[in-house]
Amino acid sequence: SLDQIVNIDILQEIQDKFSEATGLGAVIVDVGGNPITRPSNFTKFCTYIRTYPEGLTRCTACDDRGGRMTKEKKPTVYRCHSGLTDLAAPIIVQNQYIGAFLAGQVLLAQDDYDAKEDMFRCLADFDMDKEHLSELFDMVEVVPEKRITAAADLIYIMSNYIVEIGASNLAQKKLVHEVKAKADLEAS
């Protein structure tokens, strides 16, 4: 699993700095879509949605789906269950999906698209304070698609490089352990 390959504190620090630099909310999840890092820079809108059990369930399922949407093992941009734009970069070790770096919680600048209307449609079955929800939604940043695509590529490169280093360190430790065990066996 991811936490056995890489120091989670290092991933947390990278995630925090990425989020600070880009302004995007971010979290790293395991193979089941469950966070292994603390969320960074989550919007008030998303934090509010996640305070409701059904909201948290949908967000977790969406995070899981987002990470797995990457059939070609490349980053992907998608719309979450609340209508916001998210991105997912798969973390892959030896051709196996072990988690994802997720970011976003923004709106894409699009003509002829009423994002707020879409959000209310997506969340119609939630028993929430609609006025408060609307206020929080108005605080969500609108960004150009180019910025989201660049962020997706960046987190894909960063996270997979770090995981490859971690996997290499694990292989080296295993080899050292095997050499030591063989030497101990021969010495006895």
Model-derived regions, located:
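Short intrinsically disordered, low-complexity coil segments enriched in acidic
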Residues: 1-2, 188
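Structured interaction and signal-relay segments at domain junctions
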Residues: 2-83
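Sensory/regulatory domains in signal-transduction proteins
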Residues: 62-121, 146-150, 154, 161
